[in-house]
Design a protein with these regions (language model features):
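Core dinuclear metal-dependent hydrolase active-site scaffold
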Residues: 1-27, 33-93, 105-109, 143-164
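Short, charged/polar "capping" segments at the starts of alpha-helices
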Residues: 35-38, 128-134
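Short beta->alpha linker loops
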Residues: 60, 127-128
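Short linear motifs at secondary-structure transitions and domain/linker junctions
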Residues: 72-76, 98-100, 135-141
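Proline-aspartate-enriched helix->loop->beta-strand connector
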Residues: 95-100, 107-127
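Short, aromatic/basic amphipathic alpha-helical patches
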Residues: 112-113, 130-142
Length: 164
């Protein structure tokens, strides 16, 4: 799986079977090779296209999405502005990567979400990334894209990834 950042709230997740793009309140799955129509998800529910599963959960004023492919689970928090409820946090288990908004949610609250979910990777996005990174004791790593698999997940500490 390869994850790259396209600016604002937009990520691109390339898998062996398809390409997932995110944009604030939506997740779109495109078929590998551009064959077939794109499938856009804008509401809570369970979806599967091209071997990619997407689980949408209602959060206050937004929908958050788990994108599951290649034995990895990526949580995309969109533009949530409040801490997810404890009930929702318990549903968001076994997250490998979390993309978290540091503007609408705030750096402190984003850190609290990360602490509750304990992912392997954190992908902060927004204008206040530096403030979030400064509050994280282990620093960050800057990359153009993140290539990962279940076998390459870090063992000891959650890594904060900042995209160029």
């Amino acid at each position: 799986m390869d994850i790259s950042y396209s600016g604002k709230t937009n990520f691109k997740i390339k898998t062996k079977t398809g390409i997932v793009t995110t944009d604030a309140g939506a997740v779109t799955i495109a078929h590998k090779g551009g064959v077939g129509e794109d499938f856009t998800i804008t509401a809570p529910g369970e979806y599967e296209v091209e071997g990619i599963s997407v689980f949408g959960y209602a959060a206050e004023e937004a929908t958050v999405y788990i994108i599951q492919a290649e034995d990895l689970r990526v949580l995309y928090l969109g533009e949530i502005a409040k801490m997810p409820s404890e009930k929702l946090v318990t549903e968001l288990e076994n997250i490998d990567v979390v993309a978290v908004p540091v503007d609408t949610l705030g750096a402190k609250e984003a850190g609290e979400v990360v602490a509750k979910l304990e992912p392997y990777y954190v992908l902060p996005y927004g204008e206040n990334i530096a403030k979030f990174v400064a509050s994280y004791e282990h620093g960050s790593r800057t990359v153009k894209s993140l290539s990962l698999s279940k076998l390459t997940l870090p063992e000891d500490v959650t890594e904060v990834i900042v995209f160029e």
